[in-house]
């Protein structure tokens, strides 16, 4: 590290791992010249639990409850990636009803994750008021999750070939009501936050990342889309049934903290659009127990159609992963969440490599905070959106 020409003594400051703005057990060793950041070194690993090694000693159905502990604020995505890999290896078809319900759950999870990013991000830069409004909306999402899965967080809802249970009676109407209500709340956030001159002063031009730089660092998700690159795996990979809905990729050109905020805010409205279309076009309609209707062959033969069944033929707990390699990925709220899976003709995966978006997005932090003020570290770190459970695994 070069000594600045000012000749002043440098000060080394420890931020974290118990700092309230650290969003988990992240530690930063920051070298300061007065208020200016000269160098920053992130120290990781405080929350490492060996998730990749645990996967090698568990069948997929046993491993599902573990994966919700990676990104514990967007657990549906970790579940989706865990079942998508074996489904592709085993060529297992998912009924359209299950696929639609998965999309609804994924997008609700995206909204919950973005809300839980927005509240603390605003608190980090000195705006406490929106925090309480934002958490009120997040509670509504968790109420919907609790009604459908039995758990507010750590849902354990996805299964190989479908989902664990059908939607309960009245859930679809509740979810549609939430969608209508939430759209008005997003407008309120924009009035309260987006045009606030103090907020703009803190985020505009702070932590700028160019498009080419974002690609070179391997960034993904809102970090990449805020730098002028409209890349979204839901459009590119067309997994689940995303290509059956009308929605737009949200992106910005500026590449600063404000652009990342705007991308996430507009992504929430796009998620609502997708949820509304999925609820209205749900195969089988708003009935609550299609599986039992399927047994009633004489009276209702149409319920036996594959697309109406909410779950396909269940694979056995000793479902074997064929001997091949596979990389699967989904567009999680924080970026590209991927799994490199190697099967070995046994019930356990031979290798289970996790590609966490937060870990890779965090690598650019030292580059962004250099030559910035100490107070800007919290703004930049908050705009990256990390969860340490996913970073350390």
Curated annotation (Swiss-Prot):
Q: What class of enzyme is it?
A: translocase
Q: Which reaction does it catalyse?
A: a plastoquinone + NADH + (n+1) H(+)(in) = a plastoquinol + NAD(+) + n H(+)(out); a plastoquinone + NADPH + (n+1) H(+)(in) = a plastoquinol + NADP(+) + n H(+)(out)
According to the UniProt entry, what is the EC number of this protein? 7.1.1.-
One Gene Ontology cellular component term attached to this UniProt record is: chloroplast stroma
Q: GO molecular function, one example?
A: quinone binding
Q: Say if the entry is tagged with keyword Chloroplast.
A: yes
Task: Give the membrane topology.
Answer: Peripheral membrane protein
InterPro entries from the xrefs? Answer: NADH_Q_OxRdtase_suD, NADH_UbQ_OxRdtase_49kDa_CS, NDH1_su_D/H, NiFe-Hase_large
Q: How does it assemble?
A: NDH is composed of at least 16 different subunits, 5 of which are encoded in the nucleus. Interacts with the chaperonin CNP60B4 subunit.
The UniProt entry, under NCBIfam families, shows: PRK06075.1, PRK07415.1
Protein name in the entry: NAD(P)H-quinone oxidoreductase subunit H, chloroplastic
Can you name the source organism?
Arabidopsis thaliana
